[in-house]
A protein has these predicted regions:
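Positively charged, solvent-exposed patches that mediate nucleic-acid binding
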Residues: 1-111
Length: 111
């Protein structure tokens, strides 16, 4: 995923958290807000452990989001918040992201 798709500014995060809507799955909470482009941010708190663990979780979330990027049909700012637990896997994040994107109607499957 290129840097063009990353939500980086504090102002953007605040607007998504204040004005956005939320969807919930087993291991992820998704906060989203309509925008002019597709961007994703990741909010991993210190409750998840040290910096190594937090960065691993963010890498897994980024990779999961990257796999759905071609299928997203609408422009939104997304913020993914993982729930605190012991272990995380890429397959679990992908499964939960697919559920959230289908529940929110974000996927545009061209088949």
């Amino acid at each position: 995923m290129t840097l063009d798709y990353r939500l980086k500014r504090e102002k953007d995060f605040k607007s998504v958290f204040n004005k956005g809507k939320r969807l919930y799955s087993g291991s992820i909470t998704l906060v989203y807000l309509p925008s002019s482009s597709i961007k994703a941010g990741y909010a991993v708190s210190k409750k998840h452990g040290g910096s190594v663990m937090r960065n691993r979780i963010k890498r897994l979330l980024r990779e999961s989001f990257r796999s759905f990027l071609p299928d997203l049909g609408q422009n939104f700012f997304f913020v993914f918040i993982p729930k605190v637990k012991e272990d995380y896997s890429l397959s679990e994040f992908k499964k939960d992201m697919q559920y959230l994107f289908q529940k929110g109607g974000f996927l545009c499957l061209n088949s």
